[in-house]
């Protein structure tokens, strides 16, 4: 099984032959990036402990009513949005008809299935048969506007690859101008990496 959901600690462990990509949900609405690296068979670490550990350097108070030690700005949000929480470069930035440019995407639900959907009008990875790939779709929603974002993670376990894509659903009843919408941000917590970038 390439994607393992742990109901108890609300984590998704996406596993290839040699790597793990781990995402978790805290406070029922915040989707966090927890780990990407060497394969981990089971992930049982307390998410709140990790979030507080990464809190060093935060300069504003907590915005979580039930947990004064958590600060949105210090969390490694899986899909950061402009104007909210994560202070790094956002993956998503939209402008609404009323002039607002702030989006707060909350975790809604998930679904896991065999196979990978095509991306209409765009080139993308594919599998010869559905058994070669497993996909996790996570739905996020802005409670104020109704805008939905679906994050897709397709795990090609035998090929050591995870293909990510994002689908944006405008359910706001208004025109929305997308200023930025990228498929992924990945936090690298260890500094011992070599980065190779191919322009084109």
Task: Describe each region flagged by the PLM.
Residues 1-11:
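Short, Gly/Pro- and small/polar-rich lid/capping loops
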Residues 10-13, 31-200:
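Polysaccharide-binding surfaces and accessory modules of carbohydrate-active proteins
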Residues 21:
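Gly/serine-rich nucleotide phosphate-binding loop at the start of the catalytic core
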Residues 24-26:
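Contiguous, structured surface segment used for ligand recognition
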């Amino acid at each position: 099984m390439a994607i393992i959901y742990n109901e108890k600690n609300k984590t998704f462990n996406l596993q290839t032959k040699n790597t793990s990509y781990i995402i978790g949900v805290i406070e029922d609405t915040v989707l966090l990036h927890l780990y990407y690296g060497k394969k981990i068979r089971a992930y049982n670490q307390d998410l709140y402990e990790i979030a507080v550990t990464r809190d060093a350097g935060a300069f504003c108070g907590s915005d979580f009513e039930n947990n004064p030690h958590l600060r949105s700005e210090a969390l490694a949000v899986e899909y950061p949005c402009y104007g909210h929480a994560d202070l790094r470069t956002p993956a998503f930035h939209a402008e609404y008809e009323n002039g607002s440019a702030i989006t707060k995407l909350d975790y809604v639900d998930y679904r896991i299935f065999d196979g990978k959907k095509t991306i209409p009008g765009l080139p993308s990875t594919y599998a010869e048969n559905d058994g070669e790939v497993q996909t996790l779709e996570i739905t996020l929603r802005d409670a104020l506007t109704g805008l939905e974002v679906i994050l897709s993670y397709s795990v090609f376990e035998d090929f050591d690859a995870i293909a990510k894509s994002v689908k944006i659903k405008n359910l706001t009843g208004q025109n929305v101008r997308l200023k930025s919408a990228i498929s992924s941000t990945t936090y690298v917590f260890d500094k011992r990496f070599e980065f190779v970038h191919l322009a084109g």
